[in-house]
Amino acid sequence: MMNGYDKQEALEYILKRIHAKDHPELADHLPELISQTIDADMAYMHEHHVIDEDGNAGTEYYEDDEAFEYMVEKLAEENDLDPVKAVKLASLVDDYMDYQQEYLESKGLVDWDDE
């Protein structure tokens, strides 16, 4: 997990902003899916050296498109989703990424490199 990151606080922050009406097929499972998405996001960051094993900044940059694909594939597999539900999940992950970024910025946990 990323140093300074509070998963429960992030989960609550994100769930307050994601509307069940926007994801009706997944609405009954939003808390579990967002929790799994956070875990998949952190796994992506560790595996791709965005954060190191101690939770500090790693040697690589976060690649949004790559992370998005990683999370969707991981969650679709973990939840045994058919292709139609996987597409619905992709929409949820897209929303998650927006609100996760907002959360990270609100906590001062992201640093934008101008290069």
Q: For each of these PLM feature ranges, what is it?
A:
Residues A76-E115:
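Amphipathic alpha-helical binding modules
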Residues M1-A20, D113-E115:
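Hydrophobic membrane-targeting and insertion signals
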Residues I18-E25, D41, M45, H49, ...:
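Short, flexible helical or helix-coil boundary motifs
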Residues D22-Y70:
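Amphipathic alpha-helical interaction modules
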Residues K7-K16, P31, S35, D39, ...:
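An amphipathic alpha-helix signature
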